[in-house]
């Protein structure tokens, strides 16, 4: 596996990895004003993994939201509809529109508003590549011998109102008898024979039936051979399904999943279900997926050191997405943004304030990487775009972080818990959440939500101040705090004219550190603070409670945009973004490393080697840039036939003792056998 391929899975910072994942989250229904609402699915599907084949029948009960003459559903382009019938078993025509992966079914007699009917679809196809995926180049539905997965996002059954239309379902999956199927809802298993139409052998099969009787977003299925681990600790019915290669870490992931699930219960109350299946996915799909009672993690994401952040995000979706869901695309942050910040809160619980600070930095970078459209207007963006996903996830998470600062800890926690309880099993809007927050705050919060949802941009704070000596005894002895010894008068400035937020000021003195909450309004906000010790340094927002456009955030945002472009194959544009980062910090090891990656992909090995050396000699942030630069230099020397120099680089990589992303295993591998450049595809 080349370093670029790793970049997609493991070498990105968490925010970048998350962004790569988010780029490929599929679209909602093309028409925001959905003309129909699916109420229930009855699906029978037969999987033939060796042939990558599926045959299915889906009964779809739906209700017209307005007078309806044509029923439109999304369906994977590799699936061919062979027959559509109505409730009287009368055949109907069906038009396939490949441009938007839809099936259009004219209704001969129409359907009046609020009336319901059921259509039965018979369809089949092979799912073995990502060529016709709803997201080109990424598998969201795949059938194969080792592991088969059919995600709701993959449109393997007729879908309407993706992510907003809550539904119930009964899904029966017929597979070879040696396979296990994981899904959502109450499960029953029976020994059956595959339907004759689909049978190509006499091998025994089993049918797994999942009944999801609480409306949500079931429909994601994983089938394969797994080792199962169980836990009923804290009343949680947890099942972990990992491949044999990860059996050694399964107990640690089991323990962490229990801890995260119970932590979220203390914050938000009980979820829709206290059952959870954690299942390993192949490495050719999303880093993780979620569905009712299910979290899937791709194999490369299951690391020896428990990947508790990614796991926490998936588990948090059992509240935000499964239980409470967005009413529209403009409300999408109520799912992904809430899950993102729930993850950050667990990080704080597990790793302390330093862990939260790192998570907030990641969210800040994502929030400002594509801050060109207000979050409240996210529906105007293409949902396949990084802009949309950056807004709903990272800016959404940062809005909660800032609201926590405005409300205070107790009122914020009460707001989150009440929102989770009041809208459990329902779709919610941003206004629904704002009303609960205002009730607990005791005052209107229009200014806050308008500023962060209806506007773009973020402040960059600057402070200037003057210190005056007072006549208090503390001026002579900072430890004598009978009276203040110094007065600091100053001004906080920033560029946003309509900006309003409380901001924390920290004054480091010869004595104790002083903190003061200052209301910043407009471009210039004066303050006066009296201290006992002589002020030595004043910091604005030292704990990163407010989304700010600092130079570090600008640098990391440029790198994040570059990585997204690199994953899309636009290396020239990626290089431009990485160079923007260098303009902000010529010594940035991460920027040099990313530039080296681009040159490596272009097979410009001399320029790549130069950039890797610059990364090694840079600021060393993050630390892993050194070990991976050494490994990459070794690969370059192997490619150019300089084995002795290559071995020396691998040896220096081992000497760092930094095993980030499995670096030491990689170095040992190429110490034993020279790296060979992959052949270019025709």
Name each model feature, range by range.
Residues 78-139, 195-203, 207, 522-534:
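A surface-exposed beta-strand-loop module
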Residues 23-55, 63, 82, 139-143, ...:
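N-terminal, polar/Ser/Thr-rich
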Residues 294-358, 416-417:
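Zinc-dependent metallopeptidase catalytic helix centered on the HExxH motif
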Residues 213, 287, 332, 336-407, ...:
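Acidic/His/Gly-enriched intrinsically disordered linker/tail segments
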Residues 66, 272, 382, 389-484, ...:
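Amphipathic alpha-helical substructures
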Residues 81-85, 182, 445-446, 459-540:
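Beta-strand-rich binding/interaction modules
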Residues 56, 160-312, 341-344, 536:
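Hydrophobic helix-coil surface modules that form long, contiguous segments used
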Residues 113, 123-169, 547-567, 576:
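Glycine/proline-rich low-complexity spacer/linker segments in large multi-domain proteins
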């Amino acid at each position: 596996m080349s370093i670029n391929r790793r970049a997609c899975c493991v070498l990105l910072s968490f925010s970048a990895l998350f962004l790569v994942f988010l780029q490929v989250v599929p679209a909602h229904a093309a028409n925001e004003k959905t003309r129909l609402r699916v109420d229930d699915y009855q699906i029978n599907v037969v999987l033939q993994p060796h042939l990558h084949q599926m045959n299915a029948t889906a009964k779809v009960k739906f209700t017209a939201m307005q007078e309806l003459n044509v029923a439109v559903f999304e369906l994977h382009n590799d699936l061919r509809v062979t027959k559509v019938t109505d409730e009287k078993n009368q055949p109907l025509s069906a038009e396939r529109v490949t441009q938007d992966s839809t099936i259009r079914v004219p209704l001969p007699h129409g359907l009046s508003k609020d009336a319901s009917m059921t259509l039965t679809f018979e369809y089949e196809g092979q799912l073995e590549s990502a060529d016709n995926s709803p997201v080109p180049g990424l598998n969201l539905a795949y059938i194969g011998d080792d592991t088969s997965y059919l995600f709701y996002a993959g449109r393997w059954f007729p879908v309407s109102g993706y992510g907003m239309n809550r539904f119930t379902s009964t899904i029966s999956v017929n597979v070879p008898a040696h396979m296990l199927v994981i899904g959502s809802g109450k499960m029953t298993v029976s020994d059956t024979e595959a339907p004759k139409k689909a049978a190509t052998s006499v091998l025994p099969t089993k049918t797994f039936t999942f009944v999801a009787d609480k409306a949500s977003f079931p429909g994601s299925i994983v089938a394969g051979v797994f080792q199962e681990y169980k836990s009923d600790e804290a009343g949680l019915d947890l099942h972990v399904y990992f491949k044999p290669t990860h059996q050694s870490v399964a107990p640690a992931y089991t323990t962490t999943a229990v801890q995260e699930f119970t932590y979220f219960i203390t914050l938000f109350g009980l979820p829709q279900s206290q059952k959870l299946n954690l299942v390993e996915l192949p490495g050719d799909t999303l880093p993780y997926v979620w569905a009712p009672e299910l979290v899937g993690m791709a194999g490369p994401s299951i690391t020896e050191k428990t990947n508790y952040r990614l796991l926490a995000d998936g588990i948090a979706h059992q509240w935000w997405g499964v239980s409470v869901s967005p009413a529209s695309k403009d409300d999408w942050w109520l799912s992904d943004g809430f899950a993102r910040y729930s993850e950050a809160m667990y990080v704080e619980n597990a790793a302390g304030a330093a862990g939260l600070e790192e998570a907030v930095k990641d969210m800040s970078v994502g929030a400002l990487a594509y801050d060109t459209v207000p979050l409240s207007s996210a529906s105007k963006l293409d949902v396949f775009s990084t802009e949309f996903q950056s807004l709903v996830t990272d800016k959404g998470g940062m809005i909660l972080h800032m609201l926590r600062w405005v409300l205070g800890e107790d009122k914020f926690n009460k707001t989150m818990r009440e929102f989770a309880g009041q809208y459990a099993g329902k779709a919610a809007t941003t206004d629904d959440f704002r009303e609960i927050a205002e009730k607990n705050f005791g005052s209107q919060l229009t200014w806050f939500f308008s500023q962060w949802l209806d506007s773009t941009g973020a402040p960059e704070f600057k402070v200037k101040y003057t210190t005056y000596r007072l006549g208090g005894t503390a001026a002579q002895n900072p430890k004598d705090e009978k009276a203040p010894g110094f007065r600091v008068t100053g001004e906080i400035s920033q560029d946003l004219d309509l900006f309003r937020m409380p901001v924390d000021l920290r004054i480091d003195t010869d004595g104790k550190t002083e903190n003061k909450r200052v209301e910043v309004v407009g471009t210039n906000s004066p303050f006066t603070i009296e201290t006992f010790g002589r002020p030595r340094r004043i910091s604005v927002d030292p704990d990163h409670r407010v989304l700010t456009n600092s130079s570090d955030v600008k640098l990391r945002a440029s790198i994040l945009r570059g990585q997204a472009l690199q994953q899309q194959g636009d290396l020239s544009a990626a290089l431009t973004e990485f160079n923007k980062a260098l303009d902000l910090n010529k010594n940035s090891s991460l920027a040099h490393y990313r530039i080296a990656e681009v040159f490596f992909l272009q097979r410009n090995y001399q320029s790549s080697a130069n950039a890797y050396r610059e990364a090694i000699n840079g600021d060393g942030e993050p630390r892993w840039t050194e070990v991976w630069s050494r490994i990459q230099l070794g690969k370059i020397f192997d490619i150019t036939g300089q084995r002795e120099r290559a071995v020396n680089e691998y040896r220096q990589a081992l000497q760092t003792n930094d095993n980030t992303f499995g670096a030491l295993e990689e170095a040992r591998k190429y110490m034993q056998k020279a790296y060979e450049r992959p052949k270019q595809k025709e």
